[in-house]
Amino acid sequence: MSNRFAVILAAGKGTRMKSKLYKVLHPVCGKPMVQHVVDQVSQLGLQKLVTVVGHGAEMVQEQLGNVSEFALQAEQLGTAHAVDQAAGVLANEEGTTLVICGDTPLITAETMEALLQQHKEAGAMATVLTAYIEEPAGYGRIVRNENGHVEKIVEHKDANEKELAIKEINTGTYCFDNKALFASLSKVSNDNVQGEYYLPDVIEILKNEGHIVSAYQTEHFDETLGVNDRVALSQAEIIMKNRINRKNMVNGVTIIDPSNTYISADAIIGSDTVLHPGTIIEGNTVIGSDCEIGPHTVIRDSEIGDRTTIRQSTVHDSKLGTEVSVGPFAHIRPDSVIGDEVRVGNFVEIKKTVFGNRSKASHLSYIGDAQIGEDVNLGCGSITVNYDGKNKFKTVIGNGVFIGCNSNLVAPVTVEDGAYVAAGSTITENVPSKALSVARARQVNKEDYVDQLLNKKKS
């Protein structure tokens, strides 16, 4: 196999997005568009990948890291000019170069591989990725010769009646013989209304020199969608969402209502897990097998163990063990580690806490900056008082501890193994192992007080 290279065009301003965010960094199913493209082209066995950047170059470089080399297009003078900025990296290389736009997040490695194979089999100097659509208005038409090769690409505004009837269109993705590509770029003129250098002109140059220009027609037009505004962004989101949901269902995940379930592109979900409507799974979340998630649950960048149930709750940047029950209406905030067989009930908030196996906080509790042992019961209304207005402090609760309802644990404080805290207590000092701590005012009953009070009011 000859050397393979790729150039991703990611320098456009994205004016129609009307956004401060660089166009190719707009997310589709939680991942920036250009990252989708890079992840797919990286599966093609490339020797070099060059991303052409312009406005917001630093942000794109930060997103992609060392996966790609970069070339700067300081002034946007057209697609041919953009590719030419990669000459410093690629011009002297022998092989085949794929050119693709960074705003086509739906393209797949399979389609690009088929394009490259067609290019090789045809012995072509250039090959165009095309698609067939019933309503091709606005697209450049592919005119083929008697051998099935590309005779020319005609823009919609320049097409005659016969050419307008053609329904095979140019998608804007190409592959070229690398040396022929960079030799031809120097011949491209900007003699047009926009005064720009257009990459399709390379096709005409190669054709006029007698080279074969081939085409590969994909059956999946939606893969070629270029995102230039928020409308197209929403279309890409829907297509990608459906693709991800279908993949998960084929792999054994039950999605009750796919139209009302969102799964990020990088999430991994085990078989026999059930996702109820309103479930949103974001980032690099990993969910085990036999789980039940939702309805109306958000999980972001978290790891969920097997046979765990999460209902009407939010989990962010945390790790949950096996057979955990969360919700309804619980909030597990970042840097929390929840053990196995734990119960986190309704209206419980946990933040930056290690929660031991088989422990439970069944309702109406806040546990922050804490270390909770195993087999602990936190009664209704248990609160770790972790913040003094300036600093955060840690609460440590040992194994087998019982915290009664409506108790405040004022950190820094430790409740040792096996201790009990009486309901209604405010604990400000450490509690020894197996001790009962009572920190509340003694109850006083005043006999006949109400009658005396009412009689006094009447007099």
From Swiss-Prot:
<dbReference type="GO" id="GO:0000287">
    <property type="term" value="F:magnesium ion binding"/>
</dbReference>
<feature type="region of interest" description="Pyrophosphorylase">
    <location>
        <begin position="1"/>
        <end position="230"/>
    </location>
</feature>
<feature type="binding site">
    <location>
        <position position="228"/>
    </location>
    <ligand>
        <name>UDP-N-acetyl-alpha-D-glucosamine</name>
    </ligand>
</feature>
<feature type="region of interest" description="Linker">
    <location>
        <begin position="231"/>
        <end position="251"/>
    </location>
</feature>
<feature type="binding site">
    <location>
        <position position="103"/>
    </location>
    <ligand>
        <name>Mg(2+)</name>
    </ligand>
</feature>
<dbReference type="InterPro" id="IPR005882">
    <property type="entry name" value="Bifunctional_GlmU"/>
</dbReference>
<feature type="binding site">
    <location>
        <position position="366"/>
    </location>
    <ligand>
        <name>UDP-N-acetyl-alpha-D-glucosamine</name>
    </ligand>
</feature>
<keyword id="KW-0012">Acyltransferase</keyword>
<feature type="binding site">
    <location>
        <begin position="78"/>
        <end position="79"/>
    </location>
    <ligand>
        <name>UDP-N-acetyl-alpha-D-glucosamine</name>
    </ligand>
</feature>
<keyword id="KW-0963">Cytoplasm</keyword>
<dbReference type="GO" id="GO:0016020">
    <property type="term" value="C:membrane"/>
</dbReference>
<keyword id="KW-0460">Magnesium</keyword>
<protein>
    <recommendedName>
        <fullName>Bifunctional protein GlmU</fullName>
        <ecNumber>2.7.7.23</ecNumber>
        <ecNumber>2.3.1.157</ecNumber>
    </recommendedName>
</protein>
<dbReference type="Pfam" id="PF00483">
    <property type="entry name" value="NTP_transferase"/>
</dbReference>
<dbReference type="GO" id="GO:0005737">
    <property type="term" value="C:cytoplasm"/>
</dbReference>
<feature type="binding site">
    <location>
        <begin position="9"/>
        <end position="12"/>
    </location>
    <ligand>
        <name>UDP-N-acetyl-alpha-D-glucosamine</name>
    </ligand>
</feature>
<dbReference type="GO" id="GO:0009245">
    <property type="term" value="P:lipid A biosynthetic process"/>
</dbReference>
<keyword id="KW-0808">Transferase</keyword>
<feature type="binding site">
    <location>
        <position position="170"/>
    </location>
    <ligand>
        <name>UDP-N-acetyl-alpha-D-glucosamine</name>
    </ligand>
</feature>
<keyword id="KW-0511">Multifunctional enzyme</keyword>
<keyword id="KW-0573">Peptidoglycan synthesis</keyword>
<dbReference type="GO" id="GO:0006048">
    <property type="term" value="P:UDP-N-acetylglucosamine biosynthetic process"/>
</dbReference>
<feature type="binding site">
    <location>
        <position position="423"/>
    </location>
    <ligand>
        <name>acetyl-CoA</name>
    </ligand>
</feature>
<comment type="similarity">
    <text>In the N-terminal section; belongs to the N-acetylglucosamine-1-phosphate uridyltransferase family.</text>
</comment>
<dbReference type="GO" id="GO:0000902">
    <property type="term" value="P:cell morphogenesis"/>
</dbReference>
<dbReference type="GO" id="GO:0003977">
    <property type="term" value="F:UDP-N-acetylglucosamine diphosphorylase activity"/>
</dbReference>
<dbReference type="Pfam" id="PF00132">
    <property type="entry name" value="Hexapep"/>
</dbReference>
<dbReference type="InterPro" id="IPR029044">
    <property type="entry name" value="Nucleotide-diphossugar_trans"/>
</dbReference>
<feature type="binding site">
    <location>
        <position position="228"/>
    </location>
    <ligand>
        <name>Mg(2+)</name>
    </ligand>
</feature>
<dbReference type="GO" id="GO:0008360">
    <property type="term" value="P:regulation of cell shape"/>
</dbReference>
<dbReference type="InterPro" id="IPR001451">
    <property type="entry name" value="Hexapep"/>
</dbReference>
<feature type="active site" description="Proton acceptor">
    <location>
        <position position="363"/>
    </location>
</feature>
<feature type="binding site">
    <location>
        <position position="351"/>
    </location>
    <ligand>
        <name>UDP-N-acetyl-alpha-D-glucosamine</name>
    </ligand>
</feature>
<dbReference type="InterPro" id="IPR005835">
    <property type="entry name" value="NTP_transferase_dom"/>
</dbReference>
<feature type="binding site">
    <location>
        <position position="73"/>
    </location>
    <ligand>
        <name>UDP-N-acetyl-alpha-D-glucosamine</name>
    </ligand>
</feature>
<keyword id="KW-0961">Cell wall biogenesis/degradation</keyword>
<feature type="region of interest" description="N-acetyltransferase">
    <location>
        <begin position="252"/>
        <end position="459"/>
    </location>
</feature>
<comment type="pathway">
    <text>Nucleotide-sugar biosynthesis; UDP-N-acetyl-alpha-D-glucosamine biosynthesis; UDP-N-acetyl-alpha-D-glucosamine from N-acetyl-alpha-D-glucosamine 1-phosphate: step 1/1.</text>
</comment>
<dbReference type="InterPro" id="IPR038009">
    <property type="entry name" value="GlmU_C_LbH"/>
</dbReference>
<comment type="pathway">
    <text>Nucleotide-sugar biosynthesis; UDP-N-acetyl-alpha-D-glucosamine biosynthesis; N-acetyl-alpha-D-glucosamine 1-phosphate from alpha-D-glucosamine 6-phosphate (route II): step 2/2.</text>
</comment>
<feature type="binding site">
    <location>
        <position position="440"/>
    </location>
    <ligand>
        <name>acetyl-CoA</name>
    </ligand>
</feature>
<dbReference type="InterPro" id="IPR018357">
    <property type="entry name" value="Hexapep_transf_CS"/>
</dbReference>
